Amino acid sequence: MADNAPPTAETLLSGAAAHPQTAEEIANQYNLLPKLIPYLDRHLVFPLLEFSSGQDDEKEVVRAKYELLKHTNMTDYVANLWKEIHNSDTIPDEFVKKREEVLSKLQEYEEESAKITQLLQDESVVANLRSDKAANLKFLEEQHGVTVEMVNSLYEYGRFQYSCGSYGNAAELLYQFRVLSTDNDKVASATWGKLASEILTTSWDAAMEEVLKVKDSIETRLFNNPLGQLQNRSWLIHWALFPFFNHDPARDALTELFFSPAYINTIQTNCPWILRYLAAAVITNRNRAHKSSGSYQKQLKDLIRVVRQEGYEYSDPITDFVKALYIDFDFEEAQKKLGEAEDVLRSDFFLVSAADAFVEAARHLISESYCKIHQRIDIKDLSTRLGLNQDEGEKWIVNLIRDTRVDAKIDYKEGTVIMNHPPQSVYQQVIEKTKGAFFRTQVLRFVFPI
């Protein structure tokens, strides 16, 4: 299509712009990978690169994987990447040498930690351990000859296993270290390492436990370090994206965490692009039957407020959809942005599995908003805005009325829906405004602590 050609009717209905971009162009324009990488451990970046294999130039992806992992101890995998890049069946001697060094170091760590590892697998020993780490260490020292150096060897061994890509072993070793160590800095580091390991083994329940442990560590260990808290919260927000969209029970807990004053302030200050994921979570929560109406409406209002505040700092088709629908009340723009949002969702590692749910929920929200501000609705017109034919639109509206229990009736003869909108009481309006003022006050308290 020529650049100056007008859009076809089909283009308008699908929400494409007058100068339409392809799905690939939209995906590339809103690719967040460069923004996400600085906040992720290199091992956590790897799944994102793997996901991009089918979207970007394959040679560039392979080279990126090599650059990402060449400093790890995943020697065999890195050597295979080198062979693929150089189209060779042989590898340089340096890879062979490093492999031997890694195997030797693994053997050394295994021997150093063998005694304490065996003790921690002995039920009679574990039965004598208590919540007091110092007392536990004293007991193990007096009864079994365990030293602080042995405990620290668990930490070093766990880190080494992680660098080798043995994430399950790393998680277990770091857990054992954390049970005994009184070194707060190393314990905090081990908790981050265990979180990454649980993510990379897709152990989502365990990962969520570690998210909460890291959160508590940030609040206590960095209590007098606001800059450190900001940086660590930023990291935690990004790491938490893995369970956020892969583990349904995590959705509520993490949405609540992200909306808490400390974390929404972190998002607005340091990483506004996270609004994409927060918006996607809130929109898709519309489909979840167990969500209470009051809780969902609060999330939606908080999201609208933040999108309005941060529009100058960050926007993409997902946040633009929220803006068009709830701030500008522009239904044509909302439908256009929904089409673009679907392309972005399907190209985003974290959101690809939520794309269908997002589109379904977004259509419901368009319908609900449209019905709220119109007294008489033309079924054909609303169907067009939803990208549906008239029969599909009619069924959609019938289901909408049934599901939301709105006071409305359908005039099949005229092809319209007549809405009965009860007026909102002054008392209710005051409550809504008070809630908004309270939220802003809480955020300001974290921005400007007294």
Swiss-Prot record:
UniProt-listed PROSITE patterns: PCI
Transmembrane parts of this sequence: none
Molecular function per GO: translation initiation factor activity
GO biological process, one term: formation of cytoplasmic translation initiation complex
InterPro entries: eIF3e (IPR016650), eIF3e_N (IPR019010), PCI_dom (IPR000717), WH_DNA-bd_sf (IPR036390)
Keyword 4Fe-4S included in the entry's annotation: no
GO cellular component labels: eukaryotic 43S preinitiation complex; eukaryotic 48S preinitiation complex; eukaryotic translation initiation factor 3 complex, eIF3e
Protein biosynthesis is among the record's keywords: yes
Subcellular location: Cytoplasm
Keywords attached to this entry: Cytoplasm, Initiation factor, Protein biosynthesis
Disulphide bridges, residue numbers: none
Domain PCI positions: 255-424
A Pfam family reported for this protein in Swiss-Prot or TrEMBL: PCI
Domain of life: Eukaryota
Task of the protein: Component of the eukaryotic translation initiation factor 3 (eIF-3) complex, which is involved in protein synthesis of a specialized repertoire of mRNAs and, together with other initiation factors, stimulates binding of mRNA and methionyl-tRNAi to the 40S ribosome. The eIF-3 complex specifically targets and initiates translation of a subset of mRNAs involved in cell proliferation.
UniProt-listed HAMAP family: eIF3e (MF_03004)
Subunit: Component of the eukaryotic translation initiation factor 3 (eIF-3) complex.
Recorded family membership: Belongs to the eIF-3 subunit E family.
Protein name, per record: Eukaryotic translation initiation factor 3 subunit E
Organism: Aspergillus clavatus (strain ATCC 1007 / CBS 513.65 / DSM 816 / NCTC 3887 / NRRL 1 / QM 1276 / 107)
